[in-house]
Amino acid sequence: PALAKDPNNQVVAMTMRPNQPASWQGVRLVAYGAKRQSTPNIHAWVTDIEAKVIRGEAAFHCAQALKASGFTPDVIIAHCGWGESLFLKDVWPQAKLAIYSEFYYHARGADVGFDPEFPSQITEDCRIRVKNLNNLLHFEVADAGLSPTHWQASTFPEPFRSKITVIHDGIDTQAITPNAVVSLSLNTAHGA
C-alpha cells in the first residue's frame, strides 16, 4: 500500500481469492483461479510440486492477460512457497523478480529428522529433496530473495543464500522496544 500512494507507481496484486474488490488501498487486485486440481493417487513425492505447478500455471495465464491489457511490471515481489511465481518471468522476462525465501527443506536437523524419537526414513529424505524443486526452480529465475530472519535465510544453500537479503517483516523493533520501568505480575497456581 505504501508504494501505491505514489501516483507514479502502479501496484497490482494477483490473488486466488475470488470476489475481491477491484482495489485495496490503491493496489489493483486481480483475481484468478486454477483450472484443475491435483491428480488423485499421484506419487506421494510429487504431490507438492504438482500443486505448485498448477498454481503457477494459473498465475501464468493471469499474467498473460495483464500483459495483453498493457501492464508490464518493473519489479515482481512474490512468495514462492505456493508456486504462483514459477512462470511470471516467462511472461515478463525484463521484470526483476524478488521471491520471499521462507524456508529450504532439509532431511536432517530442520523440519524433519531432528527428534531421535521419530527418526526420518530414507524415503522421507527423497520426498524432502523433491519438495525443494519449487525453491530450485524459483532461484533459477529470481533476481533476489527476501527472508524475514537470518535463520530462515541460512536454511538455503549456496549459491542461493548469497542472493537473499534479510528484511524483517514483523514488528518494528527499533520503534517498539521494552520499557525498563514497566512490569507485570501474575498470580499463578504456584503462588507467584
Question: Where are the regions that the model predicts?
Answer:
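N-terminal subdomain of nucleotide-sugar transferases
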Residues: 1-27, 146
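Acceptor-binding helix/loop patch of EC 2.4 sugar-transfer enzymes
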Residues: 36-46, 94-133, 174-188
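Short, well-ordered alpha-helical microsegments
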Residues: 20, 83-86, 153-154
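Carbohydrate-associated surface elements
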Residues: 151, 170
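Structural alpha-helical scaffold elements that stabilize or flank donor/cofactor-binding regions
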Residues: 69, 137-138
